[in-house]
């Protein structure tokens, strides 16, 4: 019995600590104008096209204290400097909701999940991924959209909406699903092990340099191979 009572305070302390770890705080921070978002740490990112610029941070209070959101040279850089973020990754995720009135580029430099909550609009919008694993789902309506990634970046990019020109350069283990994005013209270069799926109505210039395929929808009258030498194939639907 003494042993049981001896452990009880310890259990209560651990329970209190766990409850504290799971506490969620929300911070709302106005921002100066920016057109580029650079993600330098692991986050769940939700993007909103709006008429102002702000960031809302949601997560464990002790981790939020170590999150920095800084605007410099029209770029919003977001960092998480918390030392213990890899100890309990499920409890240490930070949710960012970012409103912008003119986003033109997203740089994902760390493993992140990026989603739009409404449609991003503009003349040109792009996303660049340079970390090992990324997931992004974007609704867009713009004149031109581009995507490229670096080794060893893998993951999946899903695109929906409309654009006049679509430009994709995919390498490593990346997959791009743009079937729900209607484009007039496209440049598609696939050197990845993953596939590219696109929906293009006028013409496509493509190159396959890896094992991944290009699935083409939209029945464009002009489809030009610019020098494919990979094992993947063009599959027209």
Residue ranges of each PLM-predicted region?
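Bacterial Sec-dependent N-terminal signal peptides
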Residues: 1-29
């Amino acid at each position: 019995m003494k042993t049981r009572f001896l452990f009880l305070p310890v259990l209560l302390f651990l329970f209190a600590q766990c409850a504290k770890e799971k506490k969620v705080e929300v911070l709302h921070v106005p921002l100066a104008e920016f057109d580029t978002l650079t993600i330098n740490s692991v986050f769940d990112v939700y993007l909103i096209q709006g008429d102002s610029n702000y960031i809302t941070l949601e997560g464990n209070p002790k981790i939020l204290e170590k999150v920095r959101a800084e605007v410099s040279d029209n770029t919003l850089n977001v960092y998480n400097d918390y030392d213990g973020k890899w100890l309990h990754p499920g409890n240490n995720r930070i949710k960012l909701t970012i409103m912008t009135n003119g986003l033109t580029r997203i740089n994902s430099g760390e493993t992140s999940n990026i989603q739009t909550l409404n449609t991003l609009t503009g003349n040109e919008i792009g996303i660049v991924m340079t970390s090992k694993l990324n997931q992004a789902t974007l609704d867009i309506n713009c004149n031109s959209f581009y995507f490229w990634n670096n080794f060893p970046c893998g993951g999946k990019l899903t695109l929906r909406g409309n654009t006049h020109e679509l430009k994709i350069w995919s390498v490593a283990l990346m997959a791009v699903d743009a079937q729900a994005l209607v484009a007039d013209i496209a440049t598609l270069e696939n050197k990845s092990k993953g596939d590219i799926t696109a929906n293009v109505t006028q013409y496509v210039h493509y190159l396959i340099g890896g094992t991944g395929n290009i699935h083409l929808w939209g029945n464009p009258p002009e489809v030009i191979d610019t020098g494919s030498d990979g094992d993947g194939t063009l599959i027209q639907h």
